Swiss-Prot record:
The modification Phosphoserine is found at residues 37, 97, 100, 127. The modification N6,N6,N6-trimethyllysine is found at residue 3. One of its GO terms (biological process) is positive regulation of sprouting angiogenesis. The record marks 433 as: Crucial for phosphotyrosine binding. Changing residue 437 to Y: Unable to bind FBP but still activated by serine. There is a cross-link at residues 115, 266, 270 (Glycyl lysine isopeptide (Lys-Gly) (interchain with G-Cter in SUMO2)). This is Pyruvate kinase PKM. One of its GO terms (cellular component) is cilium. Pfam families: PK (PF00224), PK_C (PF02887).
């Protein structure tokens, strides 16, 4: 390890970029960043992996959990309920295979990503994997005739939006597959369009279609979404990534479908078009969190403006204390190559520096050749980026923005984070039932990991959505005496932290506890040396 900074005492946790962290200005902070300064062992940013053919076997999933996966995402635009039920079973089998060692056990969350009001093409020549080449300048007929649903080729393309002929005009653009293929409408019929291929390429089955500027009148929650969400409730998923959310009422509709049985499922709204960005505040208010879905967003709004939307949304989520996920094309080239491009490395790091709580992999883990390498790469980049955050300014601003409150949990959380900076603590240990105490601490972005001890498995899994929370599940029976039960859980967290290298004997940790059993009573902060 490099030598700790003189002001830092002896806690080894604080060597990462400490010289820079002590800078007085942001520019000085940047000047002091040092590529030879090792980051800490803990990674604070969550990693969400899409599970698909390349990663759904129990063996691969075990390796992905070891490499750092926190949330498994299932994309319901593809696959049947049977297929997804099997994937969920595999994720849980892989997760529970580590259960014999409570110290190394990681609760992995399951996320259901809805198809949402999106438009997709049909199957190419009856196969999910076939592709055809579309040549620039060629004529492509778009049809609504179901006879072609599974018989698309380079001359005719079926898609599943029945009103397309009403909402596009001659001269309109149609984008397919994240905008890789663009078509221009030349002629309109009652149930077909004739288009010219402006930008060609190879087209696969069931690709997404975007109609920028068109007033697409699809319902927020389709019939398929209702079935999928009910399936998710039965399968006990932890969160829903709701696609193409355009306004707050869309979120309420998803909430209504989840119903009483699914009331604890977190709803993360995916912002993927202009209306969603424009009405961001009302959507944030209604949601449990936000996903910056840059794929569709980059077609619906100009590509050069996506970073503005990303920074604005991450900023507002950080201000509101709600989790935000950065997604799409983060390590895209790793689908086919073992190393990312330099631009992708920067992109992952900058998403973390912007303040994202989680970063996501899509095709990289679902269908790529290097799923494990992609997870490891995100893990390494995130850790380095977290060390380079200018906490001095960040904490100051978050604290200033927080409303004055008489809520003991809020006040204790701010105090704990402030104290953790002052004494360079190795971790902040929080005992939490509903997860709220841990979320409050995470909101102030401490440098040290937050070890959240809970007996509620769902609280543990959902905690991965928040930056910095390292959830651990306590399976020991509740002790009769409250004080003994507190000690039991704090010691459990100490053992986890030592085993994982977050801190060692002699370091200090901050411990947050309640004064009586139940939720909502966290009000005590202690500074404790590690035994």
């Amino acid at each position: 390890m490099s030598k700790p900074h003189s002001e830092a005492g002896t806690a080894f946790i604080q060597t990462q970029q400490l010289h820079a962290a002590m800078a007085d200005t942001f520019l000085e902070h940047m000047c002091r960043l040092d590529i030879d300064s090792p980051p800490i062992t803990a990674r604070n940013t969550g990693i969400i992996c899409t599970i698909g053919p390349a990663s759904r076997s129990v063996e691969t999933l075990k390796e992905m959990i070891k490499s750092g996966m926190n949330v498994a995402r299932l994309n319901f635009s593809h696959g049947t309920h049977e297929y997804h039920a099997e994937t969920i079973k595999n994720v849980r089998t892989a997760t529970e295979s580590f259960a014999s060692d409570p110290i190394l056990y990681r609760p992995v969350a399951v996320a259901l990503d809805t198809k949402g009001p999106e438009i997709r093409t049909g199957l190419i020549k009856g196969s999910g994997t076939a592709e055809v080449e579309l040549k620039k300048g060629a004529t492509l007929k778009i049809t609504l005739d179901n006879a072609y649903m599974e018989k698309c080729d380079e001359n005719i393309l079926w898609l599943d939006y029945k009103n397309i002929c009403k909402v596009v005009e001659v001269g309109s653009k149609i984008y397919v597959d994240d905008g890789l293929i663009s078509l221009q409408v030349k002629q309109k019929g009652a149930d077909f369009l004739v288009t010219e291929v402006e930008n060609g390429g190879s087209l696969g089955s069931k690709k997404g279609v975007n109609l920028p500027g068109a007033a697409v009148d699809l319902p927020a929650v389709s019939e398929k979404d209702i079935q999928d969400l009910k399936f998710g409730v039965e399968q006990d998923v932890d969160m829903v990534f709701a696609s193409f959310i355009r306004k707050a009422s869309d979120v309420h509709e998803v909430r209504k479908v989840l119903g009483e049985k699914g009331k604890n499922i977190k709803i993360i709204s995916k912002i993927e078009n202009h209306e969603g960005v424009r009405r961001f505040d009302e959507i944030l208010e209604a949601s449990d969190g936000i996903m910056v879905a840059r794929g569709d967003l980059g077609i619906e709004i100009p590509a050069e403006k996506v970073f503005l939307a990303q920074k604005m949304m991450i900023g507002r989520c950080n201000r509101a204390g709600k989790p935000v996920i950065c997604a799409t094309q983060m390590l895209e080239s790793m689908i086919k190559k073992p190393r990312p491009t330099r631009a992708e490395g920067s992109d992952v790091a900058n998403a973390v520096l912007d303040g994202a709580d989680c970063i996501m992999l899509s095709g990289e883990t679902a269908k790529g050749d290097y799923p494990l390498e992609a997870v490891r790469m995100q893990h390494l980049i995130a850790r380095e980026a977290e060390a380079a955050i200018y906490h001095l300014q960040l904490f100051e601003e978050l604290r200033r923005l927080a409303p004055i409150t008489s809520d003991p949990t809020e006040a204790t959380a701010v105090g704990a984070v402030e104290a953790s900076f002052k004494c360079c603590s190795g971790a902040i240990i929080v005992l939490t039932k509903s997860g709220r105490s841990a979320h409050q601490v995470a909101r102030y972005r401490p440098r040290a990991p937050i070890i959240a001890v809970t007996r509620n498995p769902q609280t543990a899994r959902q905690a991965h959505l928040y930056r910095g929370i390292f959830p651990v599940l306590c399976k020991d029976p509740v002790q009769e005496a409250w004080a003994e039960d507190v000690d039991l859980r704090v010691n459990f967290a100490m053992n986890v932290g030592k085993a994982r290298g977050f801190f060692k004997k002699g370091d200090v940790v901050i411990v947050l506890t309640g004064w009586r059993p139940g939720s909502g009573f966290t009000n005590t902060m202690r500074v404790v040396p590690v035994p």
